[in-house]
Each structure stands twice: as structure tokens, then as C-alpha cells.
Amino acid sequence: MSRMAEQQLYIHGGCTSATSGRTFETINPANGNVLATVQAAGREDVDRAVKSAQQGQKIWAAMTAMERSRILRRAVDILRERNDELAKLETLDTGKAYSETSTVDIVTGADVLEYYAGLIPALEGSQIPLRETSFVYTRHEPLGVVAGIGAWNYPIQIALWKSAPALAAGNAMIFKPSEVTPLTALKLAEIYSEAGLPDGVFNVLPGVGAETGQYLTEHPGIAKVSFTGGVASGKKVMANSAASSLKEVTMELGGKSPLIVFDDADLDLAADIAMMANFFSSGQVCTNGTRVFIPTKCKAAFEQKILARVERIRAGDVFDPQTNFGPLVSFPHRDNVLRYIAKGKEEGARVLCGGDVLKGDSFDNGAWVAPTVFTDCSDDMTIVREEIFGPVMSILTYESEDEVIRRANDTDYGLAAGIVTADLNRAHRVIHQLEAGICWINTWGESPAEMPVGGYKHSGIGRENGVMTLQSYTQVKSIQVEMAKFQSIF
């Protein structure tokens, strides 16, 4: 593919040049080619976007619930019509296999938008009787202008997960995509405008997180920030948001999630789940079950089943329908994952497979890392303690239920957890003791629109998706009505 035209900001219904004068490049990680030069938003651009959003939000909030719902449904239709086109762009920008982006990324994002478009008329207040002559009623009112800051692994899906409930509740959103994968968020802005969204209600500001992101989190005109990314960055976003104007925050941060296989489990099922929990999207999923706990007596058989399934991984041309494994998102990220792999070897974990870059003409110019499985791991190893965000599985053994629950919870993270067992009593008993916000029994990874997702501990604050997220983009106003004559003590 030839190099794309220089990408601008999207403010008030159209593309516009950044006043900062700064640019950055976005790279195709499959081959190292530059896809496009992208303009970076500066402080003045953030000010422009906020003013635009404030104007648009008033128009948007004044529409009826059904009017807003129809516009968002039109956007859903356009997204589905252009699924393949958007998936191709997402594959170029992220390196993910087209077999994945064409069936997951846009599809699941559009599902969430459709879900919230349908919920808009159901955003109701309540009426609370006090006595015969008095009652209270409540209203869910929009926050105003909110900011979304996305991660690089699911660019358009995250943009939709954040914008759908925000817009459904009557807010305007300024979205900053990751500078690593900024392209599809700009296309989403065009789609929203085409669907009839008033100018300014969804603005997109590409830029570097330490600059553009910081300007957004500090801006007094922003009422809430929804952030997806790493823990360290999340802490900075939260601190800036609180220090500037006590903004509300939603944080979807990192994870080091446990997958517990019990001795009564079907090991074929367990191996299938472990593969999806570690190598889907080349391991670049925040909920990955990278700590795989297996009973000691089942370890050898389980390892053989994993090795057999690794042979089914097909890396190569990301547009080949048979490819199910792509490069990592960038060369700096590849190098970081390789440092973790080297650390695992240094600390005594045994490499069952992988452990290096993929080699060959198809891979030499890209950010490719081989699917890697470590075994004979211990809880104190760096690869077991820290989030790697790559195709690296760690296998650990255990002896008892109480032991594995304790060890599974022995982490600062609490995003996800899963168990594989034939005993449903055990399944519920154990899941209720795991310190994680998203849990799966005999499955892994699905996050439908109806399901609230978010973490415990350092893995985040608040939730995305589900009814409660729509409500979190509103502020509740309570109004008391008195029908009798008011009595003053003065």
C-alpha cells in the first residue's frame, strides 16, 4: 500500500490542521513501512476542540432520546457497511491479522454502539414519595464534555466502547487515540458526522500522550476522563484529572490474570482456552490469562497439548485468510517483550517453545515475536509478576484448591480470572474468591456489550459496557416538590 496523505485533526465536523506544527509517523508493524504522517494536537488545539464540543453538546443534549438513538443507529449501519474497509486499515495500523480485525474489532465496537443506542430511551429518573403533599424526583443529566484516551491494541473498538455510552447519555466526547495506532479513530469521526451527529460532539485529537493527553486531563472544560492503558500512565491521568478540576475518571488498566485448570477438567478444553487466553491478537490483550495454573500431576499432559496447538498457529501475510497470528504493534514494544523473554530465561524458567523473534523473509522487516511458552515457572519470576502484553504464556503447578486461590490473588492486578473445571459447585466457589473484575468459567475472553468490564486493585476504576456505564456518564439531580404551604420557623 502506498503512503497515505498526511492525517489531520478532526474538530467540529471536519478535518483541520494542528496549530502545534508537530507531526509523528504511524508504522505498519508487519513490514516497517510508514503508513502516514499524522499531525499532533497541541494545547491550542485542545482548547479549540473543547469549545467546539461545548457548542455541539448543547445541541445534542437538547434532542429527544429517540432522535439521538436514530443517529447512533445510523452510525452502526455505516460501520457494518464499511466493516471490511475499516478492518483493512486497522490491520495495516496494528499488524493484527485481517481474519481477526474483520470479524472482531469493528463488529464488537458496532455492537456496543447499537446496545447503547437502544438504551437511550430507558435512561429514566425515579419518583420517591415523601408524604401526601411532597415527593422527590430524579433526573439523569449529561456531564457535558468528556474525554476518552485510547490504547493501541483495539483502536476503533476502544473508541466505540468509550464514545457510545458517553454520546448516548447526551455528552460530547474528545477522543485521543494512541499515537501508535491513530488512523481508525479519525475514520470513526467521519462516520459519526455522516450519520448526523452535530458538529463538535465527537472530536478526535491525535497526539502524544504526555502532551495532548495531559492537556486533556488538565483542561477545566472536561468533566470526565475515560482512559485505557498502563498502570503508571493511569495514575498520572488520575492525578492530573483530580488536581485540575476534580474530574470523574474511568480507568481500564493492566492485568496479570490467572487461568486455573482443575484436575477434573477436560485438558483439551483447557488447552484451547489457554491458547486463546495467551495468543489471540498476538498476546496483546489486557485480559490475557498469562499465569496458567495446572495441577502438578496434569502438567506433562497439558504441556503436550499446548505444544500441539502452537503448531496450529499461522503467522505470515496478515491479509491471508489462514493467518491467525500477526506481529506486535511496534518495534519498541517488540523489543520490550524480548527483554521479558530474556529475563524469564535468566531467572530459570524453561522455554517450552518460542523464546525469540520469528525469522525468515516474511518476518525480518517486521515486529514479529514467536509464540512463547515458559514452564517450570515460580511466582517470584518477573515474567509471572509483570504484565508483558505479548505472546508469552507462563505455566505454574499447584497442589490444592486453597493454595491456587491464594497464589492467583497474589498480585497487584485484578482485571480478569478464569477457571476450567467440570464441577460447577467448585467453579462458583472458587470464582467468588478470586480478586478480579472479569471472570470466566470454562471459556475465556468474550466481552459482550451487556457485560460490565473493569478491574479490581491496580487494574482500574469504574466499568465499561453494561447499563451501569451509561449511568456513569450522567449526574443525578434530585428535585423535591412541596404541594402544601411551606412553613418557615421564622
From Swiss-Prot:
This is Betaine aldehyde dehydrogenase. Binds 2 potassium ions per subunit. Belongs to the aldehyde dehydrogenase family. NAD(+) binds at residues 150-152, 176-179, 230-233, 254, 286, 387. It is an enzyme of class 1 (oxidoreductase). The keyword Iron-sulfur does not apply. The active site is at residues 162, 252, 286, 464. It catalyses: betaine aldehyde + NAD(+) + H2O = glycine betaine + NADH + 2 H(+). The lineage of its organism: Bacteria, Pseudomonadati, Pseudomonadota, Gammaproteobacteria, Enterobacterales. Its cofactor is K(+).
